[in-house]
């Protein structure tokens, strides 16, 4: 079985046209509509790339007809190589399946005792902050809670005194009777 491939040589250099490279008035706009301003050099590059692509296609067409007879294997070779590939694929599939079964049985053997040791291992891997930083942050949080509690209780006391003076000791139940 022989496989042959032909690759075209890499294209190097830029082809230049013999036209004047000064931009014409049609290419210059006072307020460009497109985000890309088209100049003569960009249009020349696009055209040269197009010509290069056409040349490569033509070369492949001429070279492709010569190499088609070499690249096309006979039907007897195809059937033999196809069976070999199927055997290789099935052997690889069997190896993968056996490895998966071994992994599954190994995981079942470890059982749930492995769970707690895994948790302990993960806790060890956590990057804990410094103890002093934790105490400082906790102190700030407790201070904010205590301060806001004092402020809210003071506002509640003042509003209760104000309502007692405005309504002269009458409660809510006195308004409905």
Curated annotation (Swiss-Prot):
GO terms for molecular function: protein transmembrane transporter activity. Pfam families: SecE. Disruption phenotype: Seedling lethal. Albino seedlings with yellow and translucent (glassy) lateral organs when grown heterotrophically. It is found in: Plastid, Chloroplast thylakoid membrane. The chain crosses the membrane at residues 140-160. It is a single-pass membrane protein. The keyword Nucleotide-binding does not apply. Its main location: plastid. Coiled coil: none annotated. Residues 60-87 are annotated as: Disordered. Residues 1-38 form a transit peptide. InterPro entries: SECE1-like (IPR055330), SecE_bac (IPR005807), SecE_sf (IPR038379), Translocase_SecE/Sec61-g (IPR001901). Keywords: Chloroplast, Membrane, Plastid, Protein transport, Thylakoid, Transit peptide, Translocation, Transmembrane, Transmembrane helix, Transport. HAMAP family: SecE. Involved in the import/insertion pathway in the thylakoids. The signal recognition particle is not involved in the insertion of SECE1 in the thylakoid membrane. Belongs to the SecE/SEC61-gamma family. This is Preprotein translocase subunit SECE1. The gene is SECE1.
């Amino acid at each position: 079985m022989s496989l042959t491939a032909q690759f075209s040589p890499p294209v190097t250099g830029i082809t230049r046209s013999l036209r004047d490279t000064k931009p014409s008035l049609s290419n210059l706009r006072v307020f460009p509509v497109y985000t890309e301003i088209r100049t003569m050099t960009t249009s020349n590059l696009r055209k040269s790339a197009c010509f290069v692509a056409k040349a490569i296609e033509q070369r492949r067409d001429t070279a492709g007809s010569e190499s088609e007879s070499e690249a096309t294997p006979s039907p007897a070779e195809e059937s033999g190589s196809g069976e070999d590939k199927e055997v290789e694929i099935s052997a690889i599939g069997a190896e993968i399946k056996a490895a998966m079964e071994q992994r599954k049985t190994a995981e079942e053997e470890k059982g749930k005792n492995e769970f707690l040791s895994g948790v302990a291992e993960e806790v060890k891997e956590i990057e804990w902050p410094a103890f002093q930083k934790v105490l400082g942050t906790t102190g700030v949080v407790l201070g904010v809670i205590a301060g806001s509690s004092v402020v809210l209780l003071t506002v509640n006391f003042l509003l209760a005194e104000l309502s007692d003076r405005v309504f002269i000791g009458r409660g809510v139940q006195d308004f409905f009777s």
